[in-house]
Curated annotation (Swiss-Prot):
GO terms for cellular component: plasma membrane; proton-transporting ATP synthase complex. It comes from Neisseria meningitidis serogroup B (strain ATCC BAA-335 / MC58). The keyword Plastid does not apply. This is ATP synthase subunit beta. The gene is atpD. It comes from the Bacteria. GO terms for molecular function: ATP binding; ATP hydrolysis activity; proton-transporting ATP synthase activity, rotational mechanism. InterPro entries: AAA+_ATPase, ATP-synt_VA_C, ATP_synth_F1_bsu, ATPase_a/bsu_AS, ATPase_alpha/beta_chains, ATPase_F1/V1/A1_a/bsu_N, ATPase_F1/V1/A1_a/bsu_N_sf, ATPase_F1/V1/A1_a/bsu_nucl-bd. ATP binds at G148, G149, A150, G151, V152, G153, K154, T155. PROSITE patterns: ATPASE_ALPHA_BETA (PS00152). Its EC number is 7.1.2.2. F-type ATPases have 2 components, CF(1) - the catalytic core - and CF(0) - the membrane proton channel. CF(1) has five subunits: alpha(3), beta(3), gamma(1), delta(1), epsilon(1). CF(0) has three main subunits: a(1), b(2) and c(9-12). The alpha and beta chains form an alternating ring which encloses part of the gamma chain. CF(1) is attached to CF(0) by a central stalk formed by the gamma and epsilon chains, while a peripheral stalk is formed by the delta and b chains. Keywords: ATP synthesis, ATP-binding, Cell inner membrane, Cell membrane, CF(1), Hydrogen ion transport, Ion transport, Membrane, Nucleotide-binding, Translocase, Transport.
Amino acid sequence: MSQGKIVQIIGAVVDVEFPRDMIPRVYDALKLDENGLTLEVQQLLGDGVVRAIAMGSSDGLKRGMTVSNTGAPITVPVGKGTLGRIVDVLGTPVDEAGPIDTDKSRAIHQAAPKFDELSSTTELLETGIKVIDLLCPFAKGGKVGLFGGAGVGKTVNMMELINNIAKAHSGLSVFAGVGERTREGNDFYHEMKDSNVLDKVAMVYGQMNEPPGNRLRVALTGLTMAEYFRDEKDENGKGRDVLFFVDNIYRYTLAGTEVSALLGRMPSAVGYQPTLAEEMGRLQERITSTQTGSITSIQAVYVPADDLTDPSPATTFAHLDATVVLSRDIASLGIYPAVDPLDSTSRQLDPMVLGQEHYDVARGVQSTLQKYKELRDIIAILGMDELSDEDKLTVMRARKIQRFLSQPFHVAEVFTGSPGKYVALRDTIAGFKAILNGEYDHLPEQAFYMVGSIEEAVEKAKTLN
Protein backbone atom coordinates (compact mmCIF):
# COMPACT_ATOMS: atom_id res chain seq x y z
CA MET A 1 0.00 0.00 0.00
CA SER A 2 1.64 3.23 -1.18
CA GLN A 3 1.66 6.43 0.82
CA GLY A 4 1.69 10.03 -0.37
CA LYS A 5 1.61 13.55 1.02
CA ILE A 6 -0.87 16.39 0.47
CA VAL A 7 0.70 19.17 -1.61
CA GLN A 8 -2.30 21.41 -2.34
CA ILE A 9 -5.88 21.93 -1.11
CA ILE A 10 -8.49 23.97 -3.01
CA GLY A 11 -11.86 23.53 -1.31
CA ALA A 12 -12.97 19.93 -1.87
CA VAL A 13 -10.09 19.23 -4.28
CA VAL A 14 -6.87 17.82 -2.80
CA ASP A 15 -3.60 17.20 -4.69
CA VAL A 16 -1.49 14.33 -3.32
CA GLU A 17 2.07 13.45 -4.31
CA PHE A 18 3.03 9.75 -4.45
CA PRO A 19 6.29 7.98 -5.33
CA ARG A 20 6.39 7.83 -9.15
CA ASP A 21 6.39 4.04 -9.30
CA MET A 22 3.37 3.73 -6.98
CA ILE A 23 0.83 6.18 -8.43
CA PRO A 24 -2.83 5.29 -7.72
CA ARG A 25 -5.25 4.71 -10.60
CA VAL A 26 -8.17 7.01 -11.43
CA TYR A 27 -11.16 6.27 -9.11
CA ASP A 28 -8.94 4.64 -6.47
CA ALA A 29 -9.93 5.55 -2.92
CA LEU A 30 -7.28 7.24 -0.78
CA LYS A 31 -7.51 7.44 3.00
CA LEU A 32 -6.12 10.19 5.21
CA ASP A 33 -4.12 8.61 8.04
CA GLU A 34 -5.02 11.30 10.57
CA ASN A 35 -8.83 11.40 10.45
CA GLY A 36 -9.84 8.62 8.04
CA LEU A 37 -11.24 11.03 5.41
CA THR A 38 -11.71 9.30 2.05
CA LEU A 39 -10.54 10.94 -1.19
CA GLU A 40 -11.27 9.68 -4.71
CA VAL A 41 -8.66 10.10 -7.44
CA GLN A 42 -10.04 12.07 -10.41
CA GLN A 43 -6.96 13.05 -12.44
CA LEU A 44 -3.31 12.13 -12.80
CA LEU A 45 -1.37 15.39 -13.12
CA GLY A 46 2.04 13.84 -13.81
CA ASP A 47 5.23 13.88 -11.70
CA GLY A 48 3.59 11.54 -9.20
CA VAL A 49 0.84 14.05 -8.31
CA VAL A 50 -2.82 12.99 -8.37
CA ARG A 51 -5.85 15.25 -8.00
CA ALA A 52 -8.54 13.82 -5.75
CA ILE A 53 -11.96 14.92 -4.56
CA ALA A 54 -12.81 14.75 -0.84
CA MET A 55 -15.75 12.57 0.24
CA GLY A 56 -16.37 14.77 3.26
CA SER A 57 -15.35 18.11 4.67
CA SER A 58 -11.79 19.19 3.85
CA ASP A 59 -11.71 21.54 6.87
CA GLY A 60 -8.56 21.16 8.92
CA LEU A 61 -6.48 19.53 6.17
CA LYS A 62 -2.99 20.87 5.68
CA ARG A 63 -0.04 20.26 3.38
CA GLY A 64 2.29 17.46 4.32
CA MET A 65 -0.41 15.19 5.79
CA THR A 66 0.05 11.49 4.99
CA VAL A 67 -2.41 9.76 2.67
CA SER A 68 -2.61 6.00 2.00
CA ASN A 69 -3.77 4.42 -1.24
CA THR A 70 -6.32 1.64 -0.62
CA GLY A 71 -5.60 0.22 -4.10
CA ALA A 72 -9.31 -0.12 -4.93
CA PRO A 73 -12.30 2.12 -5.69
CA ILE A 74 -14.73 3.12 -2.93
CA THR A 75 -16.47 -0.10 -1.83
CA VAL A 76 -19.81 -0.19 -0.06
CA PRO A 77 -21.69 -2.93 1.81
CA VAL A 78 -24.36 -4.74 -0.24
CA GLY A 79 -26.88 -7.48 0.39
CA LYS A 80 -29.71 -8.14 2.85
CA GLY A 81 -27.87 -6.43 5.72
CA THR A 82 -28.43 -3.02 4.10
CA LEU A 83 -32.23 -3.33 4.15
CA GLY A 84 -33.96 -1.02 6.61
CA ARG A 85 -30.75 0.96 7.06
CA ILE A 86 -29.62 4.47 6.08
CA VAL A 87 -26.07 4.75 4.78
CA ASP A 88 -23.98 7.57 3.34
CA VAL A 89 -21.90 7.66 0.15
CA LEU A 90 -19.19 5.43 1.70
CA GLY A 91 -21.70 2.86 2.96
CA THR A 92 -21.26 3.99 6.57
CA PRO A 93 -24.51 3.70 8.56
CA VAL A 94 -25.89 7.05 9.74
CA ASP A 95 -29.03 5.82 11.52
CA GLU A 96 -27.30 5.05 14.86
CA ALA A 97 -28.41 1.42 14.68
CA GLY A 98 -24.97 -0.18 14.86
CA PRO A 99 -22.77 -1.65 12.12
CA ILE A 100 -24.28 -3.19 8.98
CA ASP A 101 -24.68 -6.94 9.23
CA THR A 102 -23.17 -8.09 5.94
CA ASP A 103 -19.84 -9.49 4.80
CA LYS A 104 -20.40 -8.59 1.13
CA SER A 105 -19.15 -5.39 -0.45
CA ARG A 106 -18.88 -4.01 -3.99
CA ALA A 107 -16.98 -1.22 -5.72
CA ILE A 108 -19.23 1.69 -6.72
CA HIS A 109 -17.64 1.87 -10.19
CA GLN A 110 -18.89 -1.06 -12.28
CA ALA A 111 -19.12 -1.69 -16.01
CA ALA A 112 -22.62 -1.49 -17.51
CA PRO A 113 -24.14 -4.85 -18.57
CA LYS A 114 -23.17 -5.92 -22.09
CA PHE A 115 -25.64 -5.62 -24.94
CA ASP A 116 -26.31 -9.37 -25.15
CA GLU A 117 -27.09 -9.50 -21.40
CA LEU A 118 -29.87 -6.93 -21.63
CA SER A 119 -33.53 -7.83 -21.61
CA SER A 120 -36.47 -5.80 -22.86
CA THR A 121 -39.94 -6.13 -21.43
CA THR A 122 -43.37 -4.75 -22.21
CA GLU A 123 -45.08 -5.79 -18.97
CA LEU A 124 -46.90 -2.80 -17.50
CA LEU A 125 -46.45 -1.56 -13.95
CA GLU A 126 -49.73 -0.29 -12.49
CA THR A 127 -49.25 2.77 -10.30
CA GLY A 128 -52.82 3.51 -9.20
CA ILE A 129 -52.39 7.14 -10.37
CA LYS A 130 -54.95 7.76 -13.13
CA VAL A 131 -53.07 10.26 -15.28
CA ILE A 132 -49.89 8.13 -15.30
CA ASP A 133 -51.58 4.77 -15.93
CA LEU A 134 -53.68 6.21 -18.75
CA LEU A 135 -51.31 8.57 -20.61
CA CYS A 136 -47.72 7.64 -19.75
CA PRO A 137 -47.79 4.02 -18.51
CA PHE A 138 -44.67 2.59 -16.91
CA ALA A 139 -42.96 -0.62 -18.03
CA LYS A 140 -41.59 -3.11 -15.55
CA GLY A 141 -37.83 -2.79 -15.75
CA GLY A 142 -38.13 0.59 -17.45
CA LYS A 143 -36.80 4.04 -16.61
CA VAL A 144 -39.13 6.84 -15.67
CA GLY A 145 -38.37 10.53 -15.17
CA LEU A 146 -40.50 12.98 -13.17
CA PHE A 147 -39.67 16.39 -14.62
CA GLY A 148 -40.69 19.62 -12.94
CA GLY A 149 -39.55 23.02 -11.71
CA ALA A 150 -39.33 24.05 -8.08
CA GLY A 151 -42.39 23.27 -5.97
CA VAL A 152 -44.66 21.56 -8.52
CA GLY A 153 -44.69 18.23 -6.67
CA LYS A 154 -41.86 15.96 -7.89
CA THR A 155 -41.07 14.59 -4.44
CA VAL A 156 -44.76 14.20 -3.48
CA ASN A 157 -45.40 12.30 -6.73
CA MET A 158 -42.38 10.12 -6.11
CA MET A 159 -43.49 9.40 -2.53
CA GLU A 160 -46.94 8.41 -3.82
CA LEU A 161 -45.37 6.09 -6.42
CA ILE A 162 -43.23 4.55 -3.67
CA ASN A 163 -46.36 4.24 -1.54
CA ASN A 164 -48.37 2.55 -4.31
CA ILE A 165 -45.66 0.45 -5.97
CA ALA A 166 -43.14 -0.41 -3.23
CA LYS A 167 -45.84 -1.43 -0.78
CA ALA A 168 -47.66 -3.63 -3.29
CA HIS A 169 -44.40 -4.86 -4.83
CA SER A 170 -43.05 -7.89 -3.01
CA GLY A 171 -39.46 -7.22 -4.10
CA LEU A 172 -36.79 -4.92 -2.75
CA SER A 173 -36.33 -1.18 -3.20
CA VAL A 174 -33.35 1.16 -3.00
CA PHE A 175 -33.83 4.88 -2.42
CA ALA A 176 -30.99 7.25 -3.28
CA GLY A 177 -31.40 10.78 -1.92
CA VAL A 178 -29.03 12.81 -4.07
CA GLY A 179 -28.52 16.39 -2.90
CA GLU A 180 -32.04 16.84 -1.56
CA ARG A 181 -33.37 18.13 1.76
CA THR A 182 -32.63 16.22 4.96
CA ARG A 183 -36.28 16.70 5.99
CA GLU A 184 -37.47 14.76 2.93
CA GLY A 185 -35.13 11.90 3.77
CA ASN A 186 -36.46 11.85 7.30
CA ASP A 187 -40.08 11.91 6.08
CA PHE A 188 -39.36 9.03 3.71
CA TYR A 189 -37.79 6.94 6.49
CA HIS A 190 -40.81 7.41 8.77
CA GLU A 191 -43.25 6.81 5.90
CA MET A 192 -41.59 3.45 5.20
CA LYS A 193 -41.44 2.61 8.92
CA ASP A 194 -45.10 3.41 9.54
CA SER A 195 -46.19 1.25 6.60
CA ASN A 196 -44.06 -1.73 7.71
CA VAL A 197 -42.01 -1.97 4.51
CA LEU A 198 -38.77 -0.64 6.00
CA ASP A 199 -37.24 -4.13 5.97
CA LYS A 200 -37.52 -4.15 2.14
CA VAL A 201 -35.86 -0.77 1.53
CA ALA A 202 -32.20 0.27 1.56
CA MET A 203 -31.63 4.04 1.82
CA VAL A 204 -28.58 6.00 0.69
CA TYR A 205 -28.46 9.70 1.49
CA GLY A 206 -26.17 12.53 0.44
CA GLN A 207 -28.00 15.73 1.34
CA MET A 208 -27.74 19.28 0.03
CA ASN A 209 -25.28 20.30 2.75
CA GLU A 210 -22.75 17.59 1.84
CA PRO A 211 -19.59 18.38 -0.15
CA PRO A 212 -19.89 17.96 -3.95
CA GLY A 213 -17.90 14.69 -3.92
CA ASN A 214 -20.56 13.01 -1.77
CA ARG A 215 -23.43 14.26 -3.92
CA LEU A 216 -21.66 13.15 -7.10
CA ARG A 217 -21.08 9.59 -5.91
CA VAL A 218 -24.13 8.88 -3.75
CA ALA A 219 -26.22 7.89 -6.80
CA LEU A 220 -23.54 5.31 -7.70
CA THR A 221 -23.59 3.93 -4.14
CA GLY A 222 -27.37 3.42 -4.31
CA LEU A 223 -27.13 1.95 -7.81
CA THR A 224 -24.42 -0.50 -6.70
CA MET A 225 -26.74 -1.81 -3.97
CA ALA A 226 -29.62 -2.12 -6.45
CA GLU A 227 -27.40 -3.94 -8.98
CA TYR A 228 -26.37 -6.46 -6.34
CA PHE A 229 -30.01 -7.22 -5.47
CA ARG A 230 -30.80 -7.56 -9.20
CA ASP A 231 -27.90 -9.94 -9.90
CA GLU A 232 -28.11 -12.04 -6.73
CA LYS A 233 -29.64 -15.33 -7.85
CA ASP A 234 -32.15 -17.33 -5.81
CA GLU A 235 -32.35 -21.14 -5.69
CA ASN A 236 -33.99 -21.18 -9.15
CA GLY A 237 -31.12 -19.20 -10.68
CA LYS A 238 -33.29 -16.10 -11.14
CA GLY A 239 -32.39 -12.58 -10.07
CA ARG A 240 -34.81 -10.09 -8.57
CA ASP A 241 -37.06 -7.26 -9.71
CA VAL A 242 -35.73 -4.21 -7.89
CA LEU A 243 -37.18 -0.72 -7.60
CA PHE A 244 -34.64 2.10 -7.66
CA PHE A 245 -35.75 5.61 -6.70
CA VAL A 246 -33.50 8.63 -7.23
CA ASP A 247 -34.34 12.07 -5.89
CA ASN A 248 -32.87 14.13 -7.62
CA ILE A 249 -30.89 13.43 -10.80
CA TYR A 250 -30.35 17.15 -11.41
CA ARG A 251 -28.37 17.42 -8.16
CA TYR A 252 -26.11 14.65 -9.48
CA THR A 253 -25.42 16.80 -12.55
CA LEU A 254 -24.96 19.89 -10.41
CA ALA A 255 -22.42 18.13 -8.17
CA GLY A 256 -20.60 17.09 -11.36
CA THR A 257 -20.53 20.74 -12.43
CA GLU A 258 -19.05 21.80 -9.08
CA VAL A 259 -16.41 19.07 -9.20
CA SER A 260 -15.60 19.85 -12.84
CA ALA A 261 -15.02 23.53 -12.00
CA LEU A 262 -12.83 22.60 -9.02
CA LEU A 263 -10.80 20.28 -11.26
CA GLY A 264 -10.19 23.19 -13.62
CA ARG A 265 -12.09 21.91 -16.66
CA MET A 266 -13.41 24.43 -19.17
CA PRO A 267 -17.22 24.72 -18.75
CA SER A 268 -19.53 24.01 -21.70
CA ALA A 269 -23.09 25.24 -22.42
CA VAL A 270 -24.79 27.11 -19.52
CA GLY A 271 -21.74 26.45 -17.35
CA TYR A 272 -22.22 22.66 -17.18
CA GLN A 273 -19.27 20.29 -17.21
CA PRO A 274 -17.98 19.29 -20.68
CA THR A 275 -18.42 15.62 -19.69
CA LEU A 276 -22.15 15.97 -18.89
CA ALA A 277 -23.44 13.46 -21.46
CA GLU A 278 -20.75 10.91 -20.60
CA GLU A 279 -21.33 11.16 -16.82
CA MET A 280 -25.09 10.85 -17.27
CA GLY A 281 -24.63 7.91 -19.66
CA ARG A 282 -22.30 6.12 -17.27
CA LEU A 283 -24.95 6.25 -14.55
CA GLN A 284 -28.00 5.56 -16.73
CA GLU A 285 -26.47 2.68 -18.72
CA ARG A 286 -26.05 0.75 -15.47
CA ILE A 287 -29.71 1.25 -14.49
CA THR A 288 -31.05 -1.50 -16.71
CA SER A 289 -32.67 -4.91 -16.82
CA THR A 290 -30.71 -8.06 -17.60
CA GLN A 291 -31.68 -11.66 -18.40
CA THR A 292 -31.54 -12.50 -14.67
CA GLY A 293 -33.38 -9.58 -13.03
CA SER A 294 -34.70 -6.08 -13.55
CA ILE A 295 -34.25 -2.60 -12.14
CA THR A 296 -37.29 -0.36 -12.50
CA SER A 297 -36.08 3.15 -11.81
CA ILE A 298 -38.10 6.25 -11.02
CA GLN A 299 -36.04 9.43 -11.09
CA ALA A 300 -37.05 12.94 -10.11
CA VAL A 301 -35.47 15.56 -12.36
CA TYR A 302 -35.48 19.22 -11.34
CA VAL A 303 -35.96 21.53 -14.32
CA PRO A 304 -34.09 24.82 -13.81
CA ALA A 305 -36.36 27.84 -14.42
CA ASP A 306 -38.98 25.45 -15.94
CA ASP A 307 -36.82 25.22 -19.08
CA LEU A 308 -36.95 21.68 -20.49
CA THR A 309 -34.29 22.57 -23.06
CA ASP A 310 -31.69 23.15 -20.31
CA PRO A 311 -28.75 20.77 -20.98
CA SER A 312 -29.27 18.78 -17.76
CA PRO A 313 -32.93 17.68 -18.23
CA ALA A 314 -32.40 17.49 -22.02
CA THR A 315 -29.55 14.99 -21.53
CA THR A 316 -31.68 12.92 -19.13
CA PHE A 317 -34.63 12.68 -21.59
CA ALA A 318 -32.66 10.49 -23.99
CA HIS A 319 -32.27 7.67 -21.46
CA LEU A 320 -35.88 7.32 -20.33
CA ASP A 321 -38.77 5.05 -21.34
CA ALA A 322 -41.44 7.31 -19.88
CA THR A 323 -41.41 11.00 -19.00
CA VAL A 324 -43.89 12.53 -16.59
CA VAL A 325 -43.78 16.31 -17.00
CA LEU A 326 -45.19 18.34 -14.10
CA SER A 327 -46.53 21.73 -15.13
CA ARG A 328 -46.75 24.94 -13.12
CA ASP A 329 -49.80 26.04 -15.17
CA ILE A 330 -51.71 22.92 -14.16
CA ALA A 331 -50.61 23.26 -10.52
CA SER A 332 -51.89 26.86 -10.56
CA LEU A 333 -55.36 25.52 -11.51
CA GLY A 334 -55.28 23.47 -8.30
CA ILE A 335 -55.10 20.19 -10.21
CA TYR A 336 -52.82 17.70 -8.47
CA PRO A 337 -50.89 15.64 -9.50
CA ALA A 338 -49.91 18.52 -11.82
CA VAL A 339 -48.99 16.19 -14.69
CA ASP A 340 -49.11 17.77 -18.15
CA PRO A 341 -51.21 15.27 -20.15
CA LEU A 342 -49.94 16.60 -23.51
CA ASP A 343 -46.23 16.85 -22.67
CA SER A 344 -45.89 13.53 -20.83
CA THR A 345 -45.01 10.54 -23.00
CA SER A 346 -44.24 6.85 -22.78
CA ARG A 347 -42.80 4.28 -25.15
CA GLN A 348 -45.49 1.89 -23.92
CA LEU A 349 -48.26 4.04 -25.45
CA ASP A 350 -48.74 1.57 -28.26
CA PRO A 351 -51.82 -0.55 -29.06
CA MET A 352 -49.59 -3.66 -29.34
CA VAL A 353 -48.57 -3.19 -25.69
CA LEU A 354 -51.63 -1.63 -24.05
CA GLY A 355 -54.43 -3.12 -26.11
CA GLN A 356 -56.63 -1.15 -28.51
CA GLU A 357 -59.19 0.09 -25.95
CA HIS A 358 -56.61 1.68 -23.61
CA TYR A 359 -54.77 3.23 -26.56
CA ASP A 360 -57.93 4.70 -28.10
CA VAL A 361 -59.10 6.18 -24.78
CA ALA A 362 -55.65 7.70 -24.11
CA ARG A 363 -55.47 9.27 -27.58
CA GLY A 364 -59.09 10.43 -27.28
CA VAL A 365 -58.32 12.17 -23.98
CA GLN A 366 -55.24 13.83 -25.47
CA SER A 367 -57.01 15.02 -28.63
CA THR A 368 -59.91 16.47 -26.57
CA LEU A 369 -57.47 18.33 -24.30
CA GLN A 370 -55.47 19.54 -27.31
CA LYS A 371 -58.65 20.88 -28.97
CA TYR A 372 -59.54 22.67 -25.72
CA LYS A 373 -56.04 24.17 -25.58
CA GLU A 374 -56.49 25.55 -29.11
CA LEU A 375 -59.95 26.95 -28.30
CA ARG A 376 -58.83 28.68 -25.08
CA ASP A 377 -57.56 31.76 -26.93
CA ILE A 378 -60.89 32.15 -28.73
CA ILE A 379 -62.78 31.75 -25.44
CA ALA A 380 -60.53 34.35 -23.75
CA ILE A 381 -61.17 36.93 -26.50
CA LEU A 382 -64.74 36.23 -27.64
CA GLY A 383 -66.26 34.13 -24.85
CA MET A 384 -67.94 30.71 -24.90
CA ASP A 385 -71.03 31.95 -26.77
CA GLU A 386 -69.09 32.37 -30.03
CA LEU A 387 -68.21 28.66 -30.19
CA SER A 388 -70.13 26.12 -32.25
CA ASP A 389 -72.24 23.55 -30.39
CA GLU A 390 -69.67 20.87 -31.15
CA ASP A 391 -66.84 22.99 -29.75
CA LYS A 392 -68.88 23.82 -26.63
CA LEU A 393 -69.33 20.09 -26.03
CA THR A 394 -65.59 19.50 -26.53
CA VAL A 395 -64.73 22.24 -24.02
CA MET A 396 -67.22 20.90 -21.47
CA ARG A 397 -65.85 17.36 -21.73
CA ALA A 398 -62.24 18.56 -21.72
CA ARG A 399 -62.82 20.50 -18.48
CA LYS A 400 -64.33 17.36 -16.90
CA ILE A 401 -61.39 15.25 -18.11
CA GLN A 402 -58.95 17.84 -16.76
CA ARG A 403 -60.56 17.68 -13.33
CA PHE A 404 -60.90 13.89 -13.43
CA LEU A 405 -57.13 13.65 -13.99
CA SER A 406 -56.70 15.03 -10.44
CA GLN A 407 -56.58 12.58 -7.56
CA PRO A 408 -56.13 12.70 -3.77
CA PHE A 409 -52.80 11.15 -2.68
CA HIS A 410 -52.18 8.93 0.35
CA VAL A 411 -48.98 10.80 1.21
CA ALA A 412 -50.77 14.18 1.07
CA GLU A 413 -53.59 13.03 3.36
CA VAL A 414 -52.05 14.83 6.35
CA PHE A 415 -52.15 18.15 4.45
CA THR A 416 -55.43 17.86 2.54
CA GLY A 417 -57.55 15.90 5.00
CA SER A 418 -59.05 13.85 2.14
CA PRO A 419 -58.17 10.14 2.08
CA GLY A 420 -55.85 8.97 -0.72
CA LYS A 421 -57.22 6.91 -3.60
CA TYR A 422 -55.67 4.04 -5.58
CA VAL A 423 -57.48 3.59 -8.90
CA ALA A 424 -57.13 0.30 -10.79
CA LEU A 425 -56.23 0.61 -14.48
CA ARG A 426 -59.50 -0.90 -15.75
CA ASP A 427 -61.52 1.63 -13.67
CA THR A 428 -59.37 4.48 -15.04
CA ILE A 429 -59.99 3.40 -18.66
CA ALA A 430 -63.72 2.87 -18.05
CA GLY A 431 -64.09 6.30 -16.40
CA PHE A 432 -62.38 8.30 -19.14
CA LYS A 433 -64.11 6.30 -21.87
CA ALA A 434 -67.50 7.16 -20.36
CA ILE A 435 -66.64 10.90 -20.19
CA LEU A 436 -65.46 10.86 -23.84
CA ASN A 437 -68.66 9.09 -24.92
CA GLY A 438 -70.78 11.75 -23.19
CA GLU A 439 -72.31 9.46 -20.57
CA TYR A 440 -71.69 12.05 -17.84
CA ASP A 441 -72.44 15.25 -19.76
CA HIS A 442 -75.25 15.96 -17.26
CA LEU A 443 -72.91 16.07 -14.22
CA PRO A 444 -71.27 19.35 -13.07
CA GLU A 445 -67.52 19.53 -13.72
CA GLN A 446 -66.82 20.11 -9.99
CA ALA A 447 -68.01 16.54 -9.31
CA PHE A 448 -64.94 15.18 -11.13
CA TYR A 449 -62.41 17.13 -9.06
CA MET A 450 -60.23 15.20 -6.58
CA VAL A 451 -62.04 11.86 -6.75
CA GLY A 452 -60.82 8.33 -7.44
CA SER A 453 -63.11 6.29 -9.71
CA ILE A 454 -65.99 7.61 -11.84
CA GLU A 455 -68.50 6.13 -9.35
CA GLU A 456 -67.14 8.53 -6.73
CA ALA A 457 -67.73 11.43 -9.13
CA VAL A 458 -71.38 10.35 -9.49
CA GLU A 459 -71.75 10.19 -5.68
CA LYS A 460 -70.07 13.58 -5.30
CA ALA A 461 -72.48 15.11 -7.84
CA LYS A 462 -75.42 14.11 -5.62
CA THR A 463 -73.96 16.10 -2.72
CA LEU A 464 -73.40 19.16 -4.94
CA ASN A 465 -77.04 19.45 -6.04
